[in-house]
Amino acid sequence: YQARTHIRHPKASLSDAEIQKGEIDQDYCYWAGDAVVYDDPAHGKILQMLWTGVEPGSLKNIDGCLREYSLEGEPGDGQYMSVLSTDYNFKSDGLGYGSTMFEDTEGGHIYLYTTKQVNLVSRVLVARTETLDLGSPWSYYIRDLSGDYHWQSSVPSNEEMERSYIT
């Protein structure tokens, strides 16, 4: 349903005419993250997909995007997989949570994982949604100065992340 493996980043430099000719943005782009199917009371079943914006050259995470697609109808008709919404400013912290997810349907949360490179080792961090909707508020699993883990609503600082790696 999409002819390309990514959606266009708002900072991408190619013109619409260049894209129509088949060119692909080589500077700013989004990489596909994970996705979930959410039963939205207003729209029925929707596919919620996280996209990670990457910086040209370094491929460093710089921002995020949440795009929602309709799952109403049947494959091949005009409504199925049509775009319902796109939030280009979604979780624009550049931390990349959601490259891998776990849906805890019994607990009512989606757990979102990211990694942070420390020398030659990738360290794991985790966040979770308040509900089974990716657009609901997120909490971040951090270890406080006493060594105890808990969930906090604010994005962790670099110091909090360093204390909170999951091993």
Predicted feature residues:
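Beta-rich carbohydrate-recognition and catalytic domains
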Residues: 1-28, 37-93, 104-167
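Conserved beta-strand position repeated once per blade in WD40 beta-propeller domains
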Residues: 32-34, 98-100
